[in-house]
Design a protein with these regions (language model features):
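Short, functionally important secondary-structure microenvironments
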Residues: 2-294
Length: 294
């Protein structure tokens, strides 16, 4: 896990309270630093911007990267990690594949599974591009650890993976456990097909996937395995299997509602919906003026 004495602590000259938010000058300096990191990573001049209240959503579209204005020394490394993750999408993700996914699913008669295939694609593609950055730019690893600690790892998720919840044979259970396959608390016996899914995705050799199309191929393969299993399950029933799934599970795990809330945060990250506090128009203009003056 990530610790606060790494990452930006090497270059940030900061002695203030870790929860005290940055002022406009500090935000401008942070924007400049992240822009440099992104340029080094991608080799491109990709704008890194704060989003004003009247400028719509803050999702990265492959052309620019939006960052939150609510930054302090406590969350700075995770903000940088998120920007680097989005920069990796700009460099490695083929947005044309994402835009034409409906065509691919129509051609293969899989449109009914679009929601789950897109979720699986987001998961596999994130693992693919993060693996590239993690190995090609080891200096950024602490920022990535901070990002994952903020958006993926939590005591609720850790205990939930070992507990009795999300062991029903349905899509929600598989989604929760697939998204957390890289968590050390993963239980591959929690669901009947989870180990097969784990082997198909094969996180240890994720580097074998060299394109977004390859990620989509894996997502479709996983979907087809699970869809076939669920079709068979409707005929045979799942009560006995779910009893087997709960063997060895911890009885003192968190409630389903607690897990659901933490899981929703992970799902939003996968969709690119990372909460980013916006600035007002005047503040944005002031930050831009500070940046241009240096």
């Amino acid at each position: 896990r990530y610790t606060m004495n790494k990452g930006s602590a090497y270059w940030l000259n900061e002695t203030r309270n870790t929860d005290e938010n940055f002022d406009l000058i500090e935000l401008a300096n942070t924007q400049r630093a992240i822009t440099n990191f992104v340029k080094i990573q991608t080799g491109k001049e990709i704008p890194v911007e704060f989003i004003a209240n009247n400028e719509g959503d803050s999702m990265t579209d492959g052309k620019k990267i939006a960052i939150s204005s609510l930054i302090n020394t406590h969350n700075l490394d995770s903000v940088i990690g998120t920007a680097l993750h989005e920069a990796a999408h700009c460099k490695y993700t083929d947005f044309f594949v994402l835009k034409r996914i409906a065509n691919r699913l129509l051609e293969t008669n899989l449109m009914g599974g679009r929601r789950w295939i897109e979720m699986l694609l987001n998961f596999v593609e994130d693992r693919r591009i993060d693996n590239l950055v993690y190995h090609n730019a080891p200096g950024y690893q602490d920022y990535y650890r901070a990002m994952y600690d903020r958006y993926f790892y939590s005591t609720i998720i850790d205990r939930g993976l070992k507990g009795k919840e999300y062991r029903e044979e349905n899509w929600d259970s598989y989604a929760f456990r697939i998204i957390n396959l890289f968590n050390k608390n993963t239980d591959l016996k929690a669901l009947a097909c989870l180990e097969e899914v784990y082997n198909i995705i094969d996180l240890k050799t994720i580097g074998r996937l060299t394109s977004t199309k390859h990620s989509l191929d894996v997502a479709i393969e996983v979907y087809e395995v699970l869809n076939k299993y669920f079709s068979m399950q409707k005929r045979e029933g799942s009560k006995h299997q779910e009893q087997e799934n709960r063997k060895g599970a911890k009885s003192n795990g968190p409630s389903k509602e607690e897990i659901k809330k933490a899981f929703a945060k992970q799902e939003e990250f996968l969709k690119g919906n990372v909460p980013k506090t916006k600035v007002n128009k005047k503040e944005k203009q002031q930050i831009e003026a500070i940046t241009k003056s240096k």
